[in-house]
Amino acid sequence: MNRKKSLAAVLLLCTVFGFTACGTKEQTKNGVTTKKVDKQAATDISNVHLRDKKSLYDKDHTKVTTMYLTVRRGDATENQNHSWSEVNQYSVEDYQKMHVKRYQVAGLLQVGNEDGPVSGELGYDQDVPNASVQIRGESSSKNAQKNYKIKIKKNKGEWNGQRTINLNKHQTEALRFRNKLSYDLMEEIPQLMGARTSFVHLYVKDETSDNPSGKFEDYGLYTQVEQINKNYLKDHGLDENANLYKPNFFEFFRYEDTIVKEDDPKFDKDKFEKHFGNQR
């Protein structure tokens, strides 16, 4: 009786689980016996969704980082033999008229608090420049208060995993924080890639003038925005070897014969890159 009950139980299990566990999916072909398994259908690339790496973002959106920037004349071969006054004097349009690259200076960037640089932070107890500094932006470069791009040299450290520090002043934006707010909101939107941002209180000591004061001048509040580059792709879990394009002109025209996928017969790389500059 027990044997009959056991056999009945086995038959019942085979029925419930579709005979999978009982080997009924085995098949023999050319003398080879295999057990067939169920496979998930391949995912169409059109159905793949972007997913940002949310763990990158600091949840304290009101925190302010204090930075100290000492600027000096650098090497002429690196376009850094200029004064701080010259760097802040010209707009992008001026540089285009002069047919020269944007002027730079050598910089020592240090991170700390309102009392000064802090031990363990970038640039602490250093005296040799660790970065280059130039203005950034296009139309905003005409403003009296400039935006700055600070590029930390290789092997000279980094800040929050970043070697390019973009400081935006937003002089023409009355509230001064809408750019930061927009990035904070983007963090919560699915399938939309964001960028790390932070408020920065910047102090600058100019050692390029004829009569340097030797003191740090308060430049006020800036928004630091993560540079979209190869490191960005890697840090956000994307393909760091992918092509990364930046629009040359921010506009909303479709250009259907030019802005197409690479496998489209109409794709012309030269025409495409008139609208988008390759950032790699």
Walk through the language-model features, giving the residues of each.
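Sec-dependent N-terminal signal peptides of Gram-positive bacterial secreted proteins and lipoproteins
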Residues: 3-25
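Phosphate/dinucleotide-binding and metal-coordinating scaffold of catalytic cores
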Residues: 22-280
